[in-house]
Amino acid sequence: MSSIDTPANKLQAKTLFHPEHLEYINKQLSELSPQDILKWCRWTLPSLFQTSALGLSGLVIMDMLSKMDMNVPLIFINTLHHFPETLDLLEKVKTKYPNVPVHVYRCAEAANEKEFAQKFGEKLWETDESRYDFLVKVEPASRAYSDLNVLAVFTGRRRSQGGERGSLPIVQLDGPVLKINPLANWSFTEVHNYIITNNVPYNELLNKGYRSVGDWHSTQPVREGEDERAGRWRGREKTECGLHSHPQSKFAQYMAELKKKETADQ
């Protein structure tokens, strides 16, 4: 069995939540505050994790959880191409929230950026974007979800971020996992104010004009009046990373292809 297979005895969100059920849940949760959504998740969902690249929204969720004594484990995908400031922030987060277990996953075939370039070529994100996303995000996330038996994950996505996130529900199925977006209704201003008011550590790049921070090669500061994610993949049609593409993320597509292959081999 490969590291990304899903044994029959593991819970899968898609077997527990049907579309009609999710529609009803979304209607109920849409009236709740983020904190109450987090409480509902604690009462309702086993094997609950947070996945975050340590953007402002993810940090808000982590702080809210900590204040409610909900030490939900964090999954951090090290793409090997993060800014140094992002990796510095990870260490600050560990210090600020010592009771939160942190699981770091990275590409299975390279330990650092230099090894990655040697194995897959320079600037793979330009020559084969889909393969790059798979190697540094999709496969590590798939492995994390399998290793940790993840049923549901908190994400920091918000409708105000625009693009594919404009119609984001509170909860949604993505392959075998349930994704919960407790800050879906919040604006950038609300998120930023929470960070400052509650003294939550944040990425120092935000002091240099950045608002949404991803890999160093695909992130730029935003200009006055631009959407907060305008600095991501500037000049390209892409607006979403490989983990959250709509209607089905590359992670979900990958798991579906894997299942199809297993069935054919039987």
UniProtKB/Swiss-Prot annotation:
Residues 223-243 have a biased composition (Basic and acidic residues). It is an enzyme of class 1 (oxidoreductase). Disruption phenotype: Leads to methionine auxotrophy. Gene3D superfamilies: HUPs. SUPFAM superfamilies: Adenine nucleotide alpha hydrolases-like. The keyword Membrane does not apply. Coiled coil: none annotated. GO terms for cellular component: cytosol; nucleus. GO terms for biological process: cysteine biosynthetic process; hydrogen sulfide biosynthetic process; methionine biosynthetic process; sulfate assimilation, phosphoadenylyl sulfate reduction by phosphoadenylyl-sulfate reductase (thioredoxin). Pathway: Sulfur metabolism; hydrogen sulfide biosynthesis; sulfite from sulfate: step 3/3. InterPro entries: PAPS/APS_Rdtase, PAPS_reduct_dom, PAPS_reductase_CysH, Rossmann-like_a/b/a_fold. Its EC number is 1.8.4.8. Keywords: Amino-acid biosynthesis, Cysteine biosynthesis, Cytoplasm, Methionine biosynthesis, NADP, Nucleus, Oxidoreductase. Residues 219-246 are annotated as: Disordered. It comes from the Eukaryota. It catalyses: [thioredoxin]-disulfide + sulfite + adenosine 3',5'-bisphosphate + 2 H(+) = [thioredoxin]-dithiol + 3'-phosphoadenylyl sulfate. It is found in: Cytoplasm; Nucleus. One of its GO terms (molecular function) is phosphoadenylyl-sulfate reductase (thioredoxin) activity. The keyword Cell wall biogenesis/degradation does not apply. HAMAP family: CysH (MF_00063). Belongs to the PAPS reductase family. CysH subfamily. The NADP dependent reduction of PAPS into sulfite involves thioredoxin which probably plays the role of a thiol carrier. Required for methionine synthesis. This is Probable phosphoadenosine phosphosulfate reductase. It comes from Schizosaccharomyces pombe (strain 972 / ATCC 24843).
